[in-house]
UniProtKB/Swiss-Prot annotation:
<dbReference type="InterPro" id="IPR000726">
    <property type="entry name" value="Glyco_hydro_19_cat"/>
</dbReference>
<dbReference type="GO" id="GO:0008061">
    <property type="term" value="F:chitin binding"/>
</dbReference>
<dbReference type="GO" id="GO:0008843">
    <property type="term" value="F:endochitinase activity"/>
</dbReference>
<dbReference type="InterPro" id="IPR001002">
    <property type="entry name" value="Chitin-bd_1"/>
</dbReference>
<keyword id="KW-1015">Disulfide bond</keyword>
<comment type="similarity">
    <text>Belongs to the glycosyl hydrolase 19 family. Chitinase class I subfamily.</text>
</comment>
<keyword id="KW-0325">Glycoprotein</keyword>
<dbReference type="GO" id="GO:0009627">
    <property type="term" value="P:systemic acquired resistance"/>
</dbReference>
<feature type="disulfide bond">
    <location>
        <begin position="34"/>
        <end position="42"/>
    </location>
</feature>
<keyword id="KW-0147">Chitin-binding</keyword>
<dbReference type="InterPro" id="IPR018371">
    <property type="entry name" value="Chitin-binding_1_CS"/>
</dbReference>
<feature type="disulfide bond">
    <location>
        <begin position="36"/>
        <end position="48"/>
    </location>
</feature>
<dbReference type="GO" id="GO:0072722">
    <property type="term" value="P:response to amitrole"/>
</dbReference>
<dbReference type="GO" id="GO:0009615">
    <property type="term" value="P:response to virus"/>
</dbReference>
<keyword id="KW-0611">Plant defense</keyword>
<feature type="signal peptide">
    <location>
        <begin position="1"/>
        <end position="31"/>
    </location>
</feature>
<keyword id="KW-0146">Chitin degradation</keyword>
Length: 277
């Protein structure tokens, strides 16, 4: 005959069961930060989304929002990047390959299909983004790197130590698009995020006007945005760290700072501190 369970034993069993339930219920919530799509944020509570509620304070993963290096408020991307502002950046030389390729309409089309870029963005961050675009493309003059094919032929931009992103024969992974996406691993990761096989067809970035901006948005939200909370200088290091090492490249970093200050002026916002890298 089984020994009757005492009141103390029943209480201990209830307490142990309660602790077990708390632990097992809380784990799935915490683990949700691995389940969001690449262009969605995981909130501090473990849910996916693209607004400030998800990408703001406490954001655990994804394209989390920063304070913009100075806490300036979020603005409407469409209302801030007007045709006049956009066109003021364009290089108006008649021989520019990018003339007619980079347009305000295609910029907005790309932003609408990649909502996490502009869902909660500040004027200062907009100025920072376009400062890097201006430097990388010559004020949106160049669609692809001038000497890119020659560099690709010599084996540059193909990192063989990343076998998960194999370089396709006859393909070059040199700079293309609004922020000059480079290297096989970036083409691979970006292509996966955008559902495009960019490892097999990297040239698509220089052929598709919307994709040329979407790759820039991907690079920005994945590699640059979180650095911006430390000031513009940190974004220079994130985009091209070689420009922070002195020598001739220092002039290019100075250009980025100048453009950033100029665009902040156009948008009526202070550039903040920590401009250099």
């Amino acid at each position: 005959m089984a020994k009757p369970t005492s009141r103390n034993d029943r209480f201990a069993l209830f307490f142990i069961t309660l602790i077990f339930l708390i632990l097992t219920v809380s784990k799935p919530v915490a683990s949700q930060n691995c389940g969001c799509a690449s262009d969605f944020c995981c909130s501090k509570y473990g849910y996916c989304g693209t607004t400030d509620e998800f990408c703001g304070e406490g954001c655990q993963a994804g394209p989390c929002r920063s304070s913009g290096g100075g806490g300036d408020p979020a603005v409407s991307l469409e209302g801030t990047v007007t045709p006049d502002f956009f066109n003021s950046i364009l290089n108006q030389r008649g021989d520019c390959p990018g003339k007619g390729f980079y347009t305000h309409d295609t910029f907005m089309a790309a932003a609408n299909s990649y909502p996490s870029f502009g869902a909660s963005i500040s004027k200062r961050e907009i100025a920072a983004f376009f400062a890097h675009v201006a430097q990388e493309t010559g004020f949106m003059c160049y669609i692809e790197e001038i000497d890119g094919p020659a560099k690709a032929a010599s084996g540059e931009y193909c990192d063989t130590e990343k076998p998960e992103f194999p370089c396709a024969q006859g393909k070059g992974y040199y700079g293309r698009g609004a922020i000059q996406l480079s290297w096989n691993y970036n083409y691979g990761l970006c292509g996966k995020a955008l559902d495009e096989n960019l490892l097999a067809s990297p040239e698509k970035v220089a052929q598709d006007q919307v994709l040329a901006f979407k790759t820039a948005f991907w690079f920005w939200t994945t590699n640059v945005r979180t650095s911006f909370k430390s000031g513009f200088g940190a974004t220079i290091r994130a985009v091209n760290s070689r420009e922070c090492s002195g020598g001739d490249s220092t002039a290019k970093a100075a250009n980025r700072i100048k453009y950033f200050q100029d665009y902040c002026g156009k948008l009526g916002v202070a550039p903040g501190d920590n401009l250099t890298c």
